[in-house]
Regions:
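C-terminal "cap" of GNAT-fold acetyltransferases
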Residues: 92-112, 118-136
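Conserved G/P- and acidic residue-centered "switch" motifs that form tight phosphate/ATP-binding loops
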Residues: 73-75, 90
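Alpha-helical macromolecular-interaction surfaces
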Residues: 77, 81, 103-104
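Active-site acidic-Proline motif in GNAT/NAT acetyltransferases
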Residues: 66-72, 100-101
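Acetyl-CoA-dependent GNAT
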Residues: 1-61, 66-67, 79-81, 85, ...
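Short polybasic/polar patches that bind polyanions
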Residues: 70, 87, 110
Length: 136
């Protein structure tokens, strides 16, 4: 997760991500939250986290895949794992926000059934787009 923060270090508003990474596990603690780490023989190559929101909603946070591993199915595997786990926890839908310049991430979310929604968090950066996956 720290690699993601450093990769986007020049992005306005990145400070909240750095603070979040420094207080792990924070809101991602079980039983309603979780963190997954993808590893190769060389170490960590990706991560994703789940945290609870009010009303039976789970939030996907800190999705990151190392540049060298993008386009190889790592992000999809992480998200599919998170989605399956969220279902077992009883969440009825998932939400997430992603920066508008992350076209590959938006494409991945759409391929897994996430649809665009209105802004649900006021504290996210201005150029954040929001998505939701409903389990009903």
């Amino acid at each position: 997760m720290l690699a993601h923060v450093e990769e986007r270090a020049s992005t306005p508003g990145i400070e909240h991500m750095r603070a979040d990474a420094m207080r792990l596990p924070g809101p991602y603690v079980a039983p309603l939250g979780a963190i997954w780490l993808a590893e190769s023989n060389d170490g960590a190559i990706g991560c994703v986290a789940l945290r609870p929101l009010p009303g039976g909603i789970g939030e996907v946070k800190r999705m990151y895949v190392d540049r060298a591993w993008r386009g190889k199915g790592v992000g999809r595997a992480l998200l599919e794992t998170l989605i399956a786990h969220a279902r077992t926890l009883g969440y009825h839908h998932l939400r997430l926000g992603t920066l508008s310049d992350m076209a590959a991430a938006r494409s991945l979310y759409a391929s897994l059934g996430f649809a665009p929604i209105e802004r649900y968090r006021a504290d996210e950066m201005v150029d954040t787009e929001f998505y939701e996956l409903r389990f009903e």
